[in-house]
Amino acid sequence: MPTTEADTTPASATLALAFDLLRRHSVTPNDAGCQALMIERLERLGFQVERLRIGEVDNFWATRGETGPLLVFAGHTDVVPTGPESDWQYPPFTPRIDADGMLCGRGAADMKGSLAAMVTAVETFIEAHPDHHGRLGFLITADEEGPAVHGTRAVVEHLREKGVAPDYCIVGEPSSSERLGDTLKNGRRGSLGGTLRVKGVQGHVAYPHLARNPVHEAAPALAALAEAQWDAGNAFFPATSFQISNLQAGTGASNVIPGQLEAVFNFRFSTEVTAEALKARTTEILDRFALDYTIDWTLNGEPFLTTEGALIDATVASVEDVLGYRPQLSTGGGTSDGRFIATLGAQVIELGPVNATIHKVDERIRAADLETLSRLYATIMQRLFT
């Protein structure tokens, strides 16, 4: 790993905060002090902060203002593991700007850069509009890259119990594809996971009449599931996808018929179908084959979609004003914490940096994009609240 110094001097308030966040070894579910940095800045602006330690996870909920629509900035301070640090061009928790103007470090894109831009955008907006209309909020967790049980999901339930209902939410996930702001995520597919266990009778391969092979019995059923059309999608979502991700059977010996097959699968589903309908149809297909089976289901998130409204209008117009081009609306990609916040009735979008290097060795984004992203967030607030 080279130790030659690149530019380690932040050129703006947004980059300075990003550097401070990137230095923290906040591998999920550890926050490593990132939230304290954000809270200190927000409290100076008059935010009321509620620290929420849920299980072993740090979260916080912060609000400013008493009346009017509530805009929430949402994100996560945790990052994925780096893998061998020797594979990185620079140490992953020593942020720097390289000779190409790229901000390098684990979390630069996903999503400490966005967090820094959110904080400085709010600082800029409040300085210019101290008596602004509406309310501002932050929902920040350190449990997004891991199980995502004690993070945003749990905080949302806490807010639901308190009767808090955000009107708008901007999630800072890296939504952009090739250049900043070219893509806005205005929805995400739902995710439904299942573990299918098909029971057979173990035996010797030379005596199949004394055994029952669950692989042979399950194969036609799995093929039927893979070939099924679950829906046709719609203008915003592709057709629902069924994928088998893991298949396990046998003892490892070549002369033993297995006694059980286990198949792990996942649906990524659109708003054209419900999780309950997918479960029912899966059961109906499997029952055709007279299998001895069980299924354990895990609903990771319902689909959500923001098709129109003040948030979409303000965001699209802000991208056009600041960047000079119109963003594309997309529901592609994996799940995000927006799926939990949408259940509170909020209009939800995702707007963040280019995602080309997320979860990769040498994660990086254009350093100049962070100051532009901060301007975008501030412009959205101006359009909504002035």
Swiss-Prot record:
<feature type="binding site">
    <location>
        <position position="76"/>
    </location>
    <ligand>
        <name>Zn(2+) 1</name>
    </ligand>
</feature>
<keyword id="KW-0862">Zinc</keyword>
<dbReference type="GO" id="GO:0008777">
    <property type="term" value="F:acetylornithine deacetylase activity"/>
</dbReference>
<keyword id="KW-0028">Amino-acid biosynthesis</keyword>
<dbReference type="InterPro" id="IPR002933">
    <property type="entry name" value="Peptidase_M20"/>
</dbReference>
<dbReference type="GO" id="GO:0008270">
    <property type="term" value="F:zinc ion binding"/>
</dbReference>
<feature type="binding site">
    <location>
        <position position="173"/>
    </location>
    <ligand>
        <name>Zn(2+) 1</name>
    </ligand>
</feature>
<dbReference type="GO" id="GO:0019877">
    <property type="term" value="P:diaminopimelate biosynthetic process"/>
</dbReference>
<keyword id="KW-0378">Hydrolase</keyword>
<dbReference type="Pfam" id="PF01546">
    <property type="entry name" value="Peptidase_M20"/>
</dbReference>
<keyword id="KW-0220">Diaminopimelate biosynthesis</keyword>
<keyword id="KW-0170">Cobalt</keyword>
<dbReference type="InterPro" id="IPR005941">
    <property type="entry name" value="DapE_proteobac"/>
</dbReference>
<feature type="active site">
    <location>
        <position position="78"/>
    </location>
</feature>
<dbReference type="InterPro" id="IPR011650">
    <property type="entry name" value="Peptidase_M20_dimer"/>
</dbReference>
<comment type="function">
    <text>Catalyzes the hydrolysis of N-succinyl-L,L-diaminopimelic acid (SDAP), forming succinate and LL-2,6-diaminopimelate (DAP), an intermediate involved in the bacterial biosynthesis of lysine and meso-diaminopimelic acid, an essential component of bacterial cell walls.</text>
</comment>
<comment type="subunit">
    <text>Homodimer.</text>
</comment>
<comment type="pathway">
    <text>Amino-acid biosynthesis; L-lysine biosynthesis via DAP pathway; LL-2,6-diaminopimelate from (S)-tetrahydrodipicolinate (succinylase route): step 3/3.</text>
</comment>
<feature type="active site" description="Proton acceptor">
    <location>
        <position position="144"/>
    </location>
</feature>
<keyword id="KW-0479">Metal-binding</keyword>
<keyword id="KW-0457">Lysine biosynthesis</keyword>
<dbReference type="GO" id="GO:0006526">
    <property type="term" value="P:L-arginine biosynthetic process"/>
</dbReference>
<feature type="binding site">
    <location>
        <position position="359"/>
    </location>
    <ligand>
        <name>Zn(2+) 2</name>
    </ligand>
</feature>
<dbReference type="InterPro" id="IPR036264">
    <property type="entry name" value="Bact_exopeptidase_dim_dom"/>
</dbReference>
<feature type="binding site">
    <location>
        <position position="145"/>
    </location>
    <ligand>
        <name>Zn(2+) 2</name>
    </ligand>
</feature>
<comment type="similarity">
    <text>Belongs to the peptidase M20A family. DapE subfamily.</text>
</comment>
<dbReference type="GO" id="GO:0009014">
    <property type="term" value="F:succinyl-diaminopimelate desuccinylase activity"/>
</dbReference>
<dbReference type="Pfam" id="PF07687">
    <property type="entry name" value="M20_dimer"/>
</dbReference>
<dbReference type="GO" id="GO:0009089">
    <property type="term" value="P:lysine biosynthetic process via diaminopimelate"/>
</dbReference>
<feature type="binding site">
    <location>
        <position position="110"/>
    </location>
    <ligand>
        <name>Zn(2+) 2</name>
    </ligand>
</feature>
<dbReference type="GO" id="GO:0050897">
    <property type="term" value="F:cobalt ion binding"/>
</dbReference>
<dbReference type="InterPro" id="IPR001261">
    <property type="entry name" value="ArgE/DapE_CS"/>
</dbReference>
<feature type="binding site">
    <location>
        <position position="110"/>
    </location>
    <ligand>
        <name>Zn(2+) 1</name>
    </ligand>
</feature>
<protein>
    <recommendedName>
        <fullName>Succinyl-diaminopimelate desuccinylase</fullName>
        <ecNumber>3.5.1.18</ecNumber>
    </recommendedName>
</protein>
<dbReference type="InterPro" id="IPR050072">
    <property type="entry name" value="Peptidase_M20A"/>
</dbReference>
